Amino acid sequence: MQPLDVINAAGAAWRSGISVVPVREDGSKRPDLQAWAEYQERRPTLEELVGWYGKRTDPLGRTGVGWVMGAVSGGMECLDFDDADALEDYQARALEFGAADLLGRVMDAYLEVTPRGVHLFWRCETIAGNQRLAADAAGKVRIETRGEGGYVVVAPSYGEVHPTGTPYISTGE
């Protein structure tokens, strides 16, 4: 991964109608903006995007891309599995309850591997806010949605964006 990959990804997402925001490079995974609420309502301008990421011929060295979920990004929603076991459990439960068709449609979504888990993205007309769907016995969230007004770090983010330093990887699907 290199900053040019990040610039290309930020630009491609922006051209696809996604509200893109820069990510802090301190392991917090938070937006690198004083305030980012306005980007829950409007997409950044091309000038703002270039100000955050630079140009292909003159990259600013950013290592992270964030997407704002919801209507501002054309109805984008994310199903966030915080670890690989959570995804396996989800798949097993769906099959156990006879939801193989639904599981197939969900798994056909755009998929990214995160440093610890998996993100599935799709667009739909009606999106609720962020929702916790499953937690372990200690109360740690294992599966949640990132919906209206939510925010997600996406591929090809790498380096200090995540506390582990592990990159986010697109499966290209």
Where are these regions (language model features)?
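Signature for HUH/AEP ssDNA processing cores
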Residues: 1-116, 124-126
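DNA replication initiation modules
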Residues: 70-87, 123-173
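Catalytic phosphate/metal-binding cores of nucleic-acid and nucleotide-processing enzymes, i.e., regions
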Residues: 120
